[in-house]
């Protein structure tokens, strides 16, 4: 009996794991759609990073002409959103009213938090977080718009942090 239960649970775990993290196929689709949106809008070269819910890099592209620090900036936007559980627009808003707090969190995070728009959480329909997108290269608002386009094209909900009540689960 106990062995059968263990075997049954082991078969379920991979299925649960796959639903709690963004997969490579969809992460790459997000990156590609975000870059396509940037080209449609005539934006400067972008760098796009998609992290899973654990903060690990899943998909990444840096367009020709992107500057040296763009990969780190894109990942920091996404990582900060994951670490705080809110889109980086909300982190920017907090930084404007509580700069000491955001500065302390950034120090705690080893400088891996960029408090400007462009770090967007990827949510499932049940509002669970499965990853985040970080984009840099244009204005922060344009970076964020491209992230939202990519996330929504992949069938997920984008959480920019603009409406903190919208994604409470």
Predicted region positions:
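Flexible, solvent-exposed loop/hinge segments and secondary-structure transition points
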Residues: 2-169
């Amino acid at each position: 009996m106990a062995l059968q239960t263990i075997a049954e649970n082991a078969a379920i775990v991979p299925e649960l794991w796959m639903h709690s993290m963004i997969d490579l196929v969809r992460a790459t689709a997000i990156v590609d759609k975000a870059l396509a949106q940037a080209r449609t809008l005539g934006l400067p070269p972008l760098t796009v990073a998609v992290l899973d819910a654990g903060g690990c890099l899943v998909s990444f592209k840096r367009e020709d002409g992107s500057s040296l620090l763009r990969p780190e900036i894109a990942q920091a936007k996404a990582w900060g959103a994951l670490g705080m559980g809110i889109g980086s627009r909300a982190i920017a808003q907090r930084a404007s009213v509580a700069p000491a707090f955001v500065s302390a969190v950034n120090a705690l995070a080893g400088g891996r938090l960029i408090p400007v728009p462009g770090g967007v959480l990827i949510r499932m329909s049940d509002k669970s977080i499965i990853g985040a997108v970080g984009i840099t290269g244009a204005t922060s608002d344009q970076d964020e718009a491209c992230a939202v386009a990519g996330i929504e094209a992949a069938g997920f909900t984008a959480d920019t942090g603009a409406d903190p009540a919208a994604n409470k689960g």
